[in-house]
Regions:
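Terminal amphipathic alpha-helical/low-complexity segments used for targeting or macromolecular assembly
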Residues: 1-51, 193, 199, 208-226
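Glycine-rich hexapeptide-repeat left-handed beta-helix
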Residues: 15-18, 104, 110-116, 120-226
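Short, conserved secondary-structure segments in the cores of folded domains
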Residues: 54-56, 74, 92, 168, ...
């Protein structure tokens, strides 16, 4: 399930050529910088509501709203009819499709968001690919750097694959949904249509159309008289 077509509808991005020659989807992450060097043609066609910082190497499509306080450092390509909300921080090497949301106090770097991907509140998205109509609940963090030295590994069929990447956050397949305040640890791969429940710390691979639940034990007792 690690091939680009296993996770993503490549028709839902104008940048599908990023995946040409990729055996595994994560290989596209190391190609984003070079892709932007070749394809980025700076231009602003957006509406700005207030004061925002927009760097020189940025393209923003028609109908996109950039709210007050946003910082788009670039290089970055942002598609049509997106919302870049208050205090969003879009760093280096970012490609955002059409109809996407990068919300309040979100930080994004070295990332591709397919069309209609949504990260609306207090999210960190580093070195990741977010599929068509994928969604991050409020406070979701995608961790991209492990504490122990070495490349990030991915397990497949009981074997560990070396991704060759020191920084690698997550791959979210089309329609994947991550609950509020969950953490996706480095190298997480979430299949199409799968769900991670809120407050989970997830590591590893979740197949498509699955639900990962955090069954925390709770106890309810009678309140004693004061």
């Amino acid at each position: 399930m690690f091939k680009p077509a296993d996770l993503f509808d490549l028709a839902q991005t104008e940048h599908a050529s990023l995946f040409e020659g990729c055996q595994y989807a994560w290989e596209a992450l190391s190609k984003i910088e070079g892709y932007l060097d070749t394809h980025l043609r700076p231009g602003l066609h957006n509406h700005c509501d207030g004061v925002a910082y927009i760097g020189e190497k940025v393209f923003i499509g028609q109908g996109t709203l950039v709210e007050d306080g946003a910082m788009i450092k670039g290089p970055a390509i942002i598609g049509r009819n997106c919302q870049i909300r208050h205090n969003a921080y879009i760093r280096e090497q970012v490609i955002i499709g059409d109809n996407c949301i990068v919300g309040n106090s979100c930080e994004v770097k070295n990332c591709l968001m397919f069309n209609d991907a949504v990260a609306p509140h207090f999210n960190y998205i580093g070195d990741s690919l977010l599929g068509y109509k994928s969604h991050l609940g409020a406070g979701v963090k995608i961790s991209n750097f492990k504490m122990i030295p070495g490349n990030i590994m991915v397990e497949m069929d009981g074997k560990r694959l070396d991704t060759g990447l020191r920084k690698f956050g997550a791959l979210l397949g089309d329609g994947a949904d991550i609950g509020c305040n969950a953490v996706l640890n480095p190298g997480s791969i979430i299949g199409r249509g799968s769900i991670i429940y809120p407050n989970m710390s997830w590591r590893g691979v979740l197949a498509q159309n699955m639900i990962a639940k955090n069954k925390e034990a709770k106890e309810v007792v009678v309140r004693k008289s004061m």
